Amino acid sequence: MNRYKIVSLVLAIALLASLTHLMVSQDEGHGCAKKCSAESKSGVVLQNILSRKSVRSFADRPVSREQIDTLLRAAMAAPTGRDMRPWKFVVVEGRAEMDSLAQRLPYAKMLTEAAAAIIVCGDMSVTDSHGKPSTNWTFDCSAATENLLLMAEAMGLGAVWTGVHPYEERLVAVKSALGLPEHIVPLNVIPIGYPKGEPHPKDKYDASNIHYNRW
């Protein structure tokens, strides 16, 4: 084999080695990108969950219809037993209506400062394919509420869960104030707005509450 052929062969082998290394690096990089992306996404989600807090003091700043719609889209993405979706939502924006609710509900006085409120309700007329009403509406509506609260946190808004169901006097007050039909039961009232000040979340993690395999 002459010198020219030897040099060509060496160059070809070197080129092949370089291409192989490049392909392996790209595969590893692609795998890392997918892994890093997943880790980044999970980190953002966890941080948002851990940052959520109950906000009871609000700045004098409006919340747009687009923001409310985003909150409701998040709420209705919640899990629901047998896909029955027994939830209904009442959005209150008027100052007079907000103040009226605040007067009627002892634990929702912050409505006088909030920009809006969303009342999460269960629809007792919703039935499954066998005509049976939902027995899990409180679970489904609670899941929707938590989605809403987490979305509010992610959007820089503040919100707080104020309970209505199963307290009879609160049920009567909210149904009367909002003109709810008999088959609509309010689970809670969620005041919404921009936080006043810098409220801080509570670290509620407690390893003693965890059991593996059995108690």
Model-identified regions with their sequence ranges:
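Acidic, surface-exposed loops and disordered segments
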Residues: N2-W215
